[in-house]
């Protein structure tokens, strides 16, 4: 068994664990026959920011309570380094996923998958006086609304 280094071009769109065949780069054939094929299993190192779901990239993005409640247009990172604009509609809950078409991983056919952006509403840890007063006013203005009311009602019925 011998050892040698082979250069191989890894095509765009390859996923973790996929096998690539390198024709004629394997062991020499018997009795002077042509060399066989070499199979390489690809390991894709996880990205610190982006995940992958098939041809789609995934990213989790923090948003403020105000952005989620009132709506906003936010900039999110993309793999190409150019931020992508995503519109967050008013009333967006934490965990909702938005799709930026064509901003994901490159497919084998040369097109791109999508960028799936999941928003996570961040709760402020330290409030200044004005922010605290604004939230207390909001709490007072929505005092009659209970987000758990339906859950409690359904639990009593079971």
Mark where each language-model region is.
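Charged, often glycine-enriched C-terminal and inter-domain segments
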Residues: 1-158
């Amino acid at each position: 068994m011998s050892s040698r280094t082979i250069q191989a071009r890894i095509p765009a769109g390859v996923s973790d664990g996929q096998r690539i065949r390198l024709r004629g780069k394997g062991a020499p054939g018997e009795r002077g026959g042509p060399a066989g094929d070499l199979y390489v299993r690809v390991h894709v190192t996880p990205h610190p920011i982006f995940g992958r779901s098939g041809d789609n990239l995934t990213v989790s993005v923090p948003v403020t309570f105000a952005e989620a409640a009132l709506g906003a247009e936010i900039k999110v990172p993309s793999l190409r380094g150019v931020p992508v604009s995503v519109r967050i509609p008013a009333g967006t809950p934490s965990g909702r996923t938005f799709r930026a078409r064509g901003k994901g991983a490159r497919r084998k056919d040369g097109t791109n998958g999508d960028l799936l952006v999941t928003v996570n509403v961040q709760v402020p840890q330290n409030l200044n006086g004005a922010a605290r007063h604004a939230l207390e006013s909001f709490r007072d203005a929505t005092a009659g609304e209970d987000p758990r009311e339906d859950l409690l009602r359904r639990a009593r019925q079971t």
